[in-house]
Every structure is written in structure tokens, then in C-alpha cells.
């Protein structure tokens, strides 16, 4: 339970009483993040009536899993992320701060993927050979190697070898795959292997086999109730794969009505997550399906498809990103050693002061020098000392039930749609669901309260900016000194500059410039940290434009658009498009391209159901259409 002092709405001071959380027959009182992610895992497993064997089969023994679920062991990030996805949870919920060996391995994976993504097969092969020697001694790394060899074979036109390798890779974690008729739980990674196999089986003329795989995955998507972040990666591709078979005349057209419901569900998942994965082939099929099932929506689908086709072509994006692999987009892992050292410097602590009596100064020195990885226990202990209690296993928040994470996602959407009453209700629920003894959660709830009071008129922009500034553990002008900030800290910084922008105060632009330096010129990093990058570049390009720096605003807006299209995302896309058009309006030279950009912004706003932005863009288009005439 969380109580506030009587003047909470003005001073935002917390009085904490550890809340009691009931789950099954277990009561917990906890002031650390230890165990939260495994409680979340257990809660979801039991809620979905999955057995231990269901989720650990092929990836670990029941004994290891039971120890993990009871908080008695620390396992590899590969295992934990796979387990999370198998119970339908977005894997980022278990944290992004990795040990040294895991960080290096995932960095090497990303380099291989970049080689394949860019079509540089020779470079990818060489990197894969090195990776296999260094890491190929566990089932997850060996599976990755086999999967990459399958993709290389496919790129070289050897479909026969590719399908054999895809099957071998899948059976590394799903050994009974050939006999599976119903999928109870599956990781995104495993689902993509099945989709790749289905696609190749269809290409080889094995229609019944391909249809069976697609049907299995469609049934899973329909009934699993997994998080939308996972479904956005799987559902659209599975729908398009099955419709390829039906459209070719290899299956019954009576399936169209049922497939239209699947297509609607897939489109809904993309809309909810602001993703564009497989949006074009999905919409092409929906235009056909709607002829018999939903003619009233034809115009909507036509407009969205035409806009996406035109805009993707304009950006040179002529392929489907998720064609073959759940690419490492928005999986920007951080090295926990770096986080610890940056925070030590931030607080002005010597190595000896931070080590204290809990670990040796010599060992801490080796951690800082990246000679060794700290254990999970040591990392948690050091971060607790540094004011980051809860950060090790955090996304934005740390919670033991998936509802809290969904509420946070919904909170942001409320402000887009201006549904402040719902946002207030979400805040109340979050206060009941989160343990504010964890600094990460305390900071998040303070931010939510400030944002609500600002839009409800209880505090003005100047007061809000001051309160946001006070939430940070460092001066705002020092924000650019640190490369690793928690997600909630970045969110607070961006909202601080948003307040200054609304107040037309630009004296602190140098601090904003320094903060944005980490996003400058590192295209791969921006893709890997897409969710934070897209928010940062949206606020910064708007800020620069409003400050009269139109050229720099255009540069950042265009870079943001490039990353959004490359990653097939659309959360700030309409704002970035309008930013460029608005800059040119201020210059007095609105072009046809600006009108195209604003029309695309309108289409995206309509797709998301944002009627306020639709009306705003429509008015701008109407005004400048007349001038173009």
C-alpha cells in the first residue's frame, strides 16, 4: 500500500508503507527487485494454466526452472528471455543490463545480423565462423548458428539445405516439433523458425505441410492472449502466409471469412503497438477480403495502403523487414559494468567508497575496467547503493504482474487521445500495483502525477518543469555526460524540454544538444534503441523548429523518419512528417512533398484513431492545397 503526505499534489513527497501483494497463497514484503521477474514469470504461467514442462521443455530441466521460479538461481539472458516469451511476455520486461560475456555475445550477433540485413553474405559468413568458435557451446548459441546458416543457404538459393537447417535449428529447443499439433507456448524466435519453414514448404509445393504450420500459429495467436509486442512480430506474417496459399487456389476460398477475422486481429495488434510489420501485404489481402466481408471499410484500407506504398517507396524501403527474422530492433542492451561506473562518477564516489564492506575494492576495480562481470547479487547491491534500486530488472517499471506493464503502456496512449480521465484511473491503479520502495517505480509514479497535474491545470508549465528537474539524480545540464540512463530518466528529460518548448524558453538548448549527442551518427544504435530514440528525436526536432533552427530540425526529423521506416514503426511518424512541412511553412515555401508528408501524417493519425490530429492535419492540408492551386 502506498500513502502520501497531505500536500502530495504540490510537493510530491512519498511516505512508503510496503504494500502486501497477494498471489496465490504467498504474501510478500520486498524493497528490492530481487525475484520480481520470476514472480512475474510464475504469475503468467499459472494464469495461463501452463505446466512447468510446457514452458521449459527443450530449453532447460524442470529442476533448473523450479530453482529459477523460486529465486534460487541466476540464469543466462537467453534462457530468461525465451521463458518470458514462451509465457507471452515481452522479453524486455526482464531487464536490459547484461553481464560482460552476454553483452559481447549479443553485440556479435547484431553484427552478423547487420551483415545479412545489408546483403553482405561474405562478411556475415566470416563473422558467423568467429561467433561459432567463441560461443557455440550452448544450445541457444548453437541454435543461432544453425539458423544463420539456414538463412545464408536461402540467400544463396539453396532452399533444400535451408529447410533442413531451419528444421534442425527449431528442434534444438522444440525437439518434438514434428508431432506438435497445438502450440501452448512459443518464443518469437521459435515462431519465426516455423514461419520460415512454412514459407519454404509452400515454395517447394508442399502445400498441406505449409498450411498446417500456418494454421497452428494462427490458432496460437488467436487464443494465447500473449502481449501485443510479441504478437506484432508473429501474427501479420502468419496471416499473410496462409493467405498466400488461399489466394493461389491451393486452399478453399471459404476460408476467406475466417481469415478476414485473423487479418483484422493482426491489423489491430499493429495499430496497438504502432508497428508497420507486413502492413502492405496484409492490407492488399484485406482489400480482397473486405469485398465480401466488410465493404464499408474498403476506402479506409485503400487510403492506408496507398499511403504506405507511396511513402515506403519514397524512403527506398522496398522489402518486409520481418520477412525472415525477428530483427534486433529496439533491443538495445547495456553493459551493467558501464552503468555501475557511470553512476559512481555521477555521485562522486571513489571505488573504495562504493565497495564499502560488501565487496573488495580490487574486485570493483576489475568490474569497472571490464575485466570481469559482476554477479547478479553484486550488481544489485552496487546499484542499490547508487540509487538505482529496481533498475537491474526494470523496463520502465518493475512489477510482479503483467497488468502493471500494460497500464503503463496505456497511460502514454491516453495523452495521445487526450483521455485524461482514463489516465487518472490508470495512475490510481499503478499506485496500488507498484512497490514505491524501488526508486525506479517511485520516480515513475512521481512523473505520472506531475504529467496529470499539468494537463489538468493544477500546475502550470513552469512549475511542472521545475518538478521534473528535481526528480533527476543529476543536474539537467549534465544529462549529456552519461550514455546510460534509465528509461524513466530519459522520459523525464524529454518532458522537461517539452515544457520549456511550450514556454518558448530556449536558453537551455546547449544542454539538450549535449543530451542528443549520443544519438548522433550511430545509426545501428538508434535502431537498437528505437523506442527511446524515436521519442527523443521527435521532441528535439520540434524543439529546434520552434526555436527557429529549421535546418537542424529538418536533419533530425529526416533521420527519425529514416529509422522509423527502417524499423517499421510509426509512433512519432506523423509528428516528424508534419515537423518538416511546418518548417517549410515558416520559410514560406510549402512544396508538393510537404503536402504529401502531411497527408501521410493524416493517414497515420486516422489509422491510430487520433481524431484531434486528423482534424489538425486536414485543416493544414486544406489551407495549403488552395495556395498550391
PLM segments and residue spans:
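Flexible helix-coil transition and linker loops at the boundaries of alpha-helical arrays
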Residues: 96-97, 131-142, 172-187, 220-233, ...
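Short C-terminal boundary/hinge segments that cap the last helix of small helical domains
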Residues: 88-104, 387-404
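A short, Lys/Arg-rich alpha-helix, primarily the initiator
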Residues: 8, 14-47, 318-347
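"A position-specific structural signal for the A-helix of alpha-solenoid helical repeats
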Residues: 110, 144-151, 189, 195-196, ...
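Residue register of alpha-helical TPR repeats
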Residues: 106, 144, 185, 192, ...
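Short alpha-helical DNA-recognition segment
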Residues: 48-67, 346-365
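DNA major-groove recognition helix of helix-turn-helix/homeodomain DNA-binding modules
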Residues: 76-93, 375-393, 627
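Helix-turn-helix repeat elements of alpha-solenoid scaffolds
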Residues: 115-130, 156-177, 204-223, 251-265, ...
